[in-house]
């Protein structure tokens, strides 16, 4: 499976085309809209989320609520486009009209794609860069993730995400929660945190950053249960599932790090405390005493829960802008200001769920049969029986 997205932040719409989704998957707009709404929530979001009412339109690949096996096209309209029709229109405009708009951007923002992208593509108006590099694009990545989650659900895999840290405020580790319990708690938290004791402290940190014209980042974690043993590969570097998951996390806007299992903590412990001892019994088959590997060894699943974390830096658009240089005059200026969030970590957690879900669904479809859901389900059932008796 693969997908490609298109569209600009203030353009008419965002589009994603999904290829390779098996036939026979139950899929309706409500499944996708639920995920889009989750992305819009979270303490610290900016005014843009008050403007947009993200809903999906399914325009191909689905008939009467069931996927056909052909490419699926999903569209999300940008409600704010009505205020940007001239600025972001596709038709040519005169030089006078261009000057009258006064929205040309020549002062790149530190931390964004602005300067590097302008140099790469030769854009003298940095808006040509920021409109596409904007995290608004993650709207349709969440839509794609919603389709992947539906695949996982029908294949017996559950997934959930939560926030571990915001602006240096850390949640304590809470173990032995089911995926359903994690989902219930986080859906009722403004910061998608499991630890109610630090929830308000996280919100206070966000509010302080906002009032100071600043921004803060954090850490999110995604957990998936129900993956069969041996999904992925040790044979080639580009088929290792842990590599794909880390790459997916790093592809999210403003993410600067990824961990699987105990992650970087493994460097501080001896092997005897890191590696997960193997157990077997007639009821469960092969299992592990611990899950420090985060459900992945040698690029393949172990059958234990997948545990992936991502580190999000503070959003680089600041209302108290940093120093920059005008690309036309080369004079020192403060960077341009665009409407933005003070903290998007809770929303980014939803995006992280989506990209992890896509990689897991892709791996299952690739390994157990590509064409139709019924065949994939049968093959997974047979594989699980085989693995248990191996």
Curated annotation (Swiss-Prot):
EC number: 4.2.3.5
Cofactor note: Reduced FMN (FMNH(2)).
Pathway assignment: Metabolic intermediate biosynthesis; chorismate biosynthesis; chorismate from D-erythrose 4-phosphate and phosphoenolpyruvate: step 7/7
Amino acids binding NADP(+): 39, 45
Annotated keywords: Amino-acid biosynthesis, Aromatic amino acid biosynthesis, FAD, Flavoprotein, FMN, Lyase, NADP
InterPro entries hit by this protein: Chorismate_synth, Chorismate_synth_AroC_sf, Chorismate_synthase_CS
A single BP term in Gene Ontology: amino acid biosynthetic process
GO molecular function: chorismate synthase activity; FMN binding
Keyword hit for Lyase: yes
Protein residues bound to FMN: 132-134, 253-254, 298, 313-317, 339
Pfam families: Chorismate_synt
Catalysed reactions listed for this entry: 5-O-(1-carboxyvinyl)-3-phosphoshikimate = chorismate + phosphate
Cofactor(s) this protein requires: FMNH2
GO cellular component: cytosol
Enzyme class: lyase
Family: Belongs to the chorismate synthase family.
Subunit and interaction comment: Homotetramer.
Free-text function comment from the UniProt entry: This reaction introduces a second double bond into the aromatic ring system.
Family matches, as NCBIfam families: aroC (TIGR00033), PRK05382.1 (NF003793), PRK12463.1 (NF009113)
Protein name: Chorismate synthase 2
Source species taxonomy: Bacteria, Bacillati, Bacillota, Bacilli, Bacillales
